[in-house]
Curated annotation (Swiss-Prot):
Name of the top EC class for this enzyme: transferase
Annotated Gene Ontology cellular component terms: acetyl-CoA carboxylase complex
PANTHER family: ACETYL-COENZYME A CARBOXYLASE CARBOXYL TRANSFERASE SUBUNIT ALPHA, ACETYL-COENZYME A CARBOXYLASE CARBOXYL TRANSFERASE SUBUNIT ALPHA, CHLOROPLASTIC
Lineage top rank: taxon: Bacteria
InterPro entries: Acetyl_CoA_COase_a_su (IPR001095), ClpP/crotonase-like_dom_sf (IPR029045), COA_CT_C (IPR011763)
UniProt cross-references to Gene3D superfamilies, sorted A to Z: 2-enoyl-CoA Hydratase, Chain A, domain 1
Phylogenetic lineage: Bacteria, Bacillati, Bacillota, Bacilli, Bacillales
Subcellular location: Cytoplasm
Stated name of the protein: Acetyl-coenzyme A carboxylase carboxyl transferase subunit alpha
Pfam families per the UniProt record, alphabetical: ACCA (PF03255)
Major localization listed first in the record, in broad terms: cytoplasm
Signal peptide feature range: none
GO molecular function list: acetyl-CoA carboxylase activity; ATP binding; carboxyl- or carbamoyltransferase activity
NCBIfam families: accA, AccA_sub, PRK05724.1
Organism, scientific name: Staphylococcus epidermidis (strain ATCC 12228 / FDA PCI 1200)
């Protein structure tokens, strides 16, 4: 339960208590239950339509929030995962493969968090090593060769900052991805489904279209990290989240992303199938638009999109 959900939790407890009492004591409490359920519905709508940036950060980090592998079966047909970077090893934090979207052969790449402690250790909490980014680039170049559109799912706190990752060229692998993705001649569409953290997100995020789920975040650093750097106090993370403009609506206003995908009330985890179908609908919409561009226009469109970010109006 998140802090802002406490009032809803209290109402649910009262409803459960009345239902238990009604069943146990064989008394009619249905009117009271109906009133509380109506109140819960109103309060739920009120809470989730007035979320603050820090509230959305907490939702984006929920362990039960759907991951890349949760969404893929709903969106793509006959998905086959491909492994390895052909240089060092396979990275379970970065998954990729080929499948079909509406009958069209496509390449799918995404960061993958774990579902529990054991899985998170295996997936390195969704923080990819250099070999993960090199695997992603290998699949992107393969997609370009066979003229397959590329879809990426961004869901990471950032690239793994460990000693071994740095020794194997973490910054180089991300930098190369940025360079190569900028010139790909096939459509590239990215969606931020949870946290989009720093260069770890950008390593698979240089795309013609950047979409975000309503309660996802996209930033150069976490609110805690920003607060610690700017004010020497990570406890000021809530203020940092407000200041940094990391939510989907803020980034849409700033022109950083192209579209916000609505979530079920309460977050994507409330109905992952409905959420997945919403993502699929947006994928098809933007893919149909990008199909009108030539290979050269696709590369130029992508380059210009990111070239304009951060421009200053005097």
């Amino acid at each position: 339960m998140l802090d802002f959900e406490k009032p809803l939790f209290e109402i649910r407890n009262k409803i459960d208590s009345l239902k238990e009492s009604q069943e146990k004591n064989e008394v009619d409490l249905q009117d009271e239950i109906d009133m509380l359920e109506a109140s819960l519905k109103r309060e739920t709508t009120k809470v989730y339509t007035n979320l603050k940036p820090w509230d959305r950060v907490q939702i984006a980090r929920l362990p039960e929030r759907p991951t890349t592998l949760d969404y893929i079966p709903y969106i793509f047909d006959s998905f086959i995962e491909l492994h390895g970077d052909r240089s060092f090893r396979d990275d379970p934090a970065m998954i990729g493969g080929i499948g079909y979207l509406d009958g069209k052969s496509v390449t799918v790449i995404g960061q993958q968090r774990g579902k529990d402690t054991k899985d998170n250790i295996y997936r390195n909490f969704g923080m990819a090593h250099p070999e993960g980014y090199r695997k992603a680039l290998r699949l992107m170049k393969q997609a370009e060769k066979f003229n397959r559109p590329i879809f990426t799912f961004i869901d990471t706190k950032g690239a793994y900052p460990g000693k071994a990752a740095e020794e194997r060229g973490q910054s180089e692998s991300i930098a190369k991805n940025l360079m190569e993705m900028a010139s790909l001649t096939v459509p590239v569409i990215a969606v931020v489904i949870g946290e989009g953290g720093s260069g770890g997100a950008l390593g698979i995020g240089i795309s013609n279209r950047v979409l975000m789920l309503e309660n996802s975040t996209y930033s150069v650093i976490s609110p805690e990290g920003a607060a610690a750097l700017l004010w020497k106090d990570s406890n000021l993370a809530q203020i940092a989240a407000e200041t940094m403009k990391i939510t989907a609506l803020d980034l849409l206003d700033l022109g950083i992303i192209d579209e916000v995908i609505n979530e079920p009330l309460g977050g994507a985890q409330k109905d992952e199938e409905v959420q997945a179908l919403s993502i699929k609908k947006m994928f098809l919409k933007h893919l149909n638009e990008l199909k009108q561009l030539t290979p050269e226009e696709l590369a130029n469109d992508r380059f210009e999109k990111f070239r304009k970010i951060g421009s200053v109006v005097e």
